Amino acid sequence: MSATVADPCPRAGRPSRSASRRPGAAWRFWRSPAGQPPWARPALLATAVVAAVLYAWNITSSGFALYYSDAVKSMSVSWKALLFGAMDPGATITPDKIPGSFVPQALSARLFGFHAWSVTLPQCVEGVICVLVLHRVVRRWAGPVAGITAAALFTCTPVVASMFGHSMEDGGLTFCLVMAADCAQRALLDARLRSLVLSGVWVGLGFQAKMLQAWMVLPALATAYLVAAPVRLRRRVGHLLVAGVVCLAVSLSWVVMMTVVPAKDRPYVDGSTDNSAFAMVFGYNGLERFGIHVPGSVASTGSGGAARGTRPGGTASWRAGGFGGAPFPGTRAPGNGVFPAGGGKAARNGGTGEGTGSARPFAGGRGGPGAPGGGPGGMDAGPSWLKLFQSRFAPQIGWLYPFALLTLVLGVWWRRRAGRGDRTLGGLVLWGGWLVVVGVVFSAMGSIPHTAYMATLAPPLAALTAAGAVLMRRAYRAGGPRGWALPVAVAAEAVWSWYLSSFHPDFLPWLKWLTAAACLAGVAAMVLGRVTRRTRSRLVTAGVLAGLAGAVVTPVAWSASVLDPAYAGSAFDAGAGPSAMGGGRARAVPGAAGASRGGPGGDITTRLTADERKLYAYVKSRQGGARYVLATDGWNAASPYILATGDTVLPMGGFSGSVPHPSPGDFTALVRGGRLRFVLLSGSGGGFPGRGGTAGATGRVRTWVRAHCAAVPSARYGVTTTQAFGGGGTLYECAPERA
C-alpha cells in the first residue's frame, strides 16, 4: 500500500490581529508575521530586491517602442488624448490597441517628463508587486516554502526579467492577472462574493491592457471556484454570474465609450476600416489571429500577425528576418531604413547602416513594432502544437515545463478523491487551468508577433513548480510509489534543460554541464535514499536540494543576463539571453544600441535631427491659425515630431497604412477650412513597404496633394538635399482656395 501524503496546504487558522501584533512591528517590516517561519519575510524582501534590480537595471537605456511610444507621448500632453487613448496629440486616431496599458506610462511621463526611464518605471513597479502578490497567493495555497519559491521562480523567468524592464503592454496585463488570481483565491477559500467580483474587475482591467488575452484565464478562475468554493452549487453559480457581469462591464468600458461618443468628438479607431472599436478589439486583435475575418477590421499585418503569410497589400511573402524591400523614405527607421532584423549588422552598429541619409540611432534595438527580430518573417509559422516547445519561445518561458506539468497531472490524480472545498485541488485547477488554456490558445493562434505574450504563462508555471516541489518532497519522505515522483521530475528537468541549452550552445556553455551534474547528483542521492529507506538523512536532503537547484540554475542565469544590455531585450519585444531568431546562435542586439550616436540611451529617439528641426521650424512659423502643424502620410514620418515636440501632427493611414483616416473628403475639408496647411509625403505609407501607392484612402489623399498642393523646395527651409528625408520625402503647402 502507498503511504498517505500529507496535505501541503494545512488549514491553519488565521491568527487574530491582537495575536499577530508585536511591539514596534510596524517599524520591523523585515520580521516575519506570526505563524510564518522567521526566514520568510527576509527571504521575500530579498527576492523583491532582486526583482527590482533585474527589472530596473537598464531603465535609463530601455528605449521606446515605435508607434506605441507616440501614443504615450500624446497621452502625456493632452487630456483628451489620455481619455480616449489617442496616438497623436491632436487626438485624431487611436493606436491599434486598447490604450489601457499606456495610461500608467503617460501619467508617469506627465509627472517626470517624457524619458525612457519614466515610461518604463510603471512596468518595473508592476513587476515587483507581481512578485510580492504571487508569493502571497502561493503561500496561502501551499505554504511559505512554496510561496518564496514561486516568487523566486517568477522573478527569474527570462521573458519576465526582460519584459518588466521595458515599456510593454504585457507587463500591465501580467500584473492585472496576478492580482485577479489573488482575489479569486481568497474567494475560493471563503466563498465571499466581494473577492470574486474584485477578481472580475482585475481581469477587466487586464482586458484594457491587452484585450482578449486577459479573458484566457477566466475558464480557470471559474472552474476553480466551482470545484472548491465551500458553498452550495446554486450560490457558486450565482456568484460567478455576478462576477462575470462585472468583468464584462469593466472589459468593454472603452469599447462602449468609443461606440457611444459621436465619431466627430473622438479619435478614429485604428485597426478598423469603419471606425469601429468592436472590429478593432474582436477582429483585428482577436479572431484575425486565427484567420477569421471580422467585417470592419483591418486584415492582420505585422502587428496582428502574419498568419496569411503575405505582405501588406497582398504582395509576396515577407522575407525572412526583416521586411525586405526598399528603405522607408521620409522616415527614420534604423539601419538601412527597415526595422533591424534581430542582430543584423546595422542594428549592432547602433542603427547606422547605409540607406537613408537621416538614418539615426534607434533606442531599443531588436525589432519593429510588428514583430520581434525585425518583422513578420521572424514570427512563428502559424498554428502548431509544438510552437511553445521550440527555439523561439521555450528558452524564454519553458524551462519549468516538465516539473509544472508533472505537478498538475500527479497532483490532480492524487487529490481526485478529495471533497469539495479542498484547497490543494482548487489551486491545481486554478493554476493548471490557466496554464493549459493559455498554452492551447497560443498554440492555435496563427502567429504570435511578440515573445512577450509568453509572460502570461510565467505565474502558473512558477506556482505549479513551487507547489509541486513541496508536494513531491513530502511524498518522497513518506515513501511508497509516489515517492518516485521527485527524482523523476528532477531527471526530466535535467534532460529538458539540456535540450533547451542546445539551441544556443555558445551561450554560457558550462551551464548545461552544471545542470546535468547537479541533477544527476540529486537523482542519485534520492534513489539511494529510497533504496536504503533513509529519505531524511542529511546526505539525501543535500542531494534533493542540489537536484532542485540544478533544475533552475540555467533560467536563473538567462534572467541574470539582462544586467548586460546586450542580452536585455528591447522595448519592441522581451527576451533575455541570446536571441532565438538568429538560427540558434545569434547574440542579442544591445537594447541601448542607439546610444552610440549623439545622446543618452533611450532618450535618443526624442530628438529631431538638424534637418528635421529646420523643417519643423519652417512649418511651425507658418502654421498661423491651422489646427495641425503638419500632416504626414504615415505614422513613421510623424513619429519624430510627435516624440520631440508633442505638437499636433496629423498621421494618416493608421499603423498598417490601410486605415481610411482621414478620408479624401475629410482631408480636403481640413485644407479648405484652413485647419491644415503643410503635408509631408514620404511615399512609404504607414510603417510598411508596399503602402506608398495610390490605392486606398491615404493613397488617394497622396495623389490629391501632389495634384493640388505646391511642393516646397527643401532649400527654402535650409536643407540643401532631399537626402535629409531618405531621398523621397517632399513637403507640400496646401492653399485653402485650391481645395
Regions flagged by a language model, labelled:
Residues 265, 273, 661-671:
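Alpha-helical scaffolding within the catalytic cores
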Residues 566, 613-625, 635-643, 647-648, ...:
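Aromatic/acidic, Gly/Pro-rich catalytic loop(s) in extracytoplasmic/lumenal soluble domains
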Residues 123, 175, 215, 280, ...:
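Structural recognition of the beta-strand scaffold that forms the well-ordered cores
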Residues 479-582, 600-606:
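Transmembrane helical bundles and short interhelical boundary loops of multi-pass, membrane-embedded
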Residues 280-284, 307, 316, 326, ...:
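Membrane-interface segments at or immediately adjacent to transmembrane helices
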Residues 1-298, 303-485, 492-496, 561, ...:
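Membrane-integral, polyisoprenol-dependent glycosyltransferases
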Residues 558, 643-654:
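Short helix-loop-beta junction
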